[in-house]
Amino acid sequence: MKLNDLSPAPGSRREKHRPGRGIGSGLGKTGGRGHKGQTSRSGGTIAPGFEGGQQPLHRRLPKFGFVSLKAMDRAEVRLSELAKVEGDIVTVQSLKDANVINQNVQRVKIMLSGEVTRAVTIKGIAATKGARAAIEAAGGKFEE
């Protein structure tokens, strides 16, 4: 016996439906599409969200909120992510080089999450009170 001789046991697998292939299949003639109408035609589909002329749900509900443009150029960095930066000086550019933040980020804030493993000098980056205390306790310092 070889792999090409293997076949499933008789009756264990059902044949797939082939619409429009004879009356005996149960899906002959109209192929399960019903009789006349838009959806019986080839290419006959309605647009997603179309509700037959009734005001669609996405137009019945009010608009709300907006996308803050500030969120696009600001980022938060955890204390544990500072270890990914090579060298002892951490700047916005060094965080970008270490792929910690996106290239379009301009302002960064360090959050108290994780631990500082070494003493680092932070230049031009804001930090929360807890993060500032943790960095200074590890022997690091802040420069504006």
From Swiss-Prot:
GO BP, sorted A to Z: translation
Region called Disordered, residue ranges: 1-57
Comp. bias intervals (Gly residues): 21-31
GO (cellular component) term, any one: cytosolic large ribosomal subunit
Alphabetized GO MF terms: rRNA binding; structural constituent of ribosome
Domain of life of the native organism: Bacteria
Name of one Pfam family that matches: Ribosomal_L27A
Keyword line: Ribonucleoprotein, Ribosomal protein, RNA-binding, rRNA-binding
Subunit description: Part of the 50S ribosomal subunit.
PANTHER family referenced in this protein's UniProt entry, alphabetically: 50S RIBOSOMAL PROTEIN L15, LARGE RIBOSOMAL SUBUNIT PROTEIN UL15M
NCBIfam families listed in its UniProt record: rplO_bact
Function: Binds to the 23S rRNA.
Homology family: Belongs to the universal ribosomal protein uL15 family.
Full protein name: Large ribosomal subunit protein uL15
